[in-house]
Design a protein with these regions (language model features):
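Aromatic (Trp/Tyr/Phe) and Gly/Pro-enriched flexible surface segments
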Residues: 1-119, 142-154, 160-182
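Short edge beta-strand/loop segments characteristic of extracellular beta-sandwich folds
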Residues: 121-125
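Extended, low-complexity, turn-rich repeat/linker tracts enriched in Gly/Pro/Ser/Thr and Asp/Glu
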Residues: 126-133, 139-144, 157-160
Length: 182
């Protein structure tokens, strides 16, 4: 695939396969943002990685799974005050360009749909991190980290007909949201 040859990322990029076997890049993760702090790191240390170690759903009966980990961004993260990178996987696009000015604008959630979804099924396990910290890296005593899973359906044009895309700032609060499962 030409896109694979141009990007040559050192992290995992997620995609679906079309009926004729072509890659459809409709999934995104923040791995491109983590690359800013981990230029030469191996793909396995990124926040969002595939796993096939027998620990998946029902003892590995269903094969591979995605491991999402909150990762330390090291010295670079301390300097720019972006100390953590959360593992995530979503339908949409991740653009690392605003990472230093407004991290929440990096995520652009969603793709157009034309049918009403009936259900979303899946399996997950969650293990909280050892400590919860504030944006300055100081531990928050007495609180435990929480993972989140949510689905959002929204109108992709505002009342004036302008195209919109939700991002990390408004993914759960935008007035164009028509359904939210959290």
């Amino acid at each position: 695939d030409p896109k694979d040859k141009v990007l040559k990322p050192k992290y995992y990029i997620w995609y679906d396969l079309s009926p004729n076997g072509k890659k459809i890049y409709d999934w995104a993760s923040g791995n491109a943002g983590f690359k800013l702090s981990n230029y030469d790191g191996k793909p396995e240390i990124y926040p969002t990685v595939p796993m096939d170690d027998g620990n998946g759903p029902e003892g590995g009966k269903y094969g591979k799974y995605v491991k999402l980990t909150t990762s330390d961004t090291g010295a670079w993260g301390v300097i720019v005050n972006r100390r953590l990178a959360a593992g995530n996987l979503f339908i949409g696009v991740f653009d690392p360009m605003p990472a230093l000015t407004n991290t929440l604008l990096c995520t652009r959630f969603g793709l157009p749909f034309s049918k009403k979804p009936l259900r979303l099924t899946g399996y997950y396990k969650y293990k909280p991190g050892e400590k919860l910290q504030d944006k300055n890296g100081k531990p928050i005593e007495g609180k435990i980290d929480r993972g989140t899973i949510y689905a959002v359906m929204y109108r992709n044009h505002d009342a004036n007909g302008n195209a919109i895309v939700l991002n990390g700032n408004d993914v759960k609060t935008n007035p164009n949201i028509v359904a939210l499962a959290d």
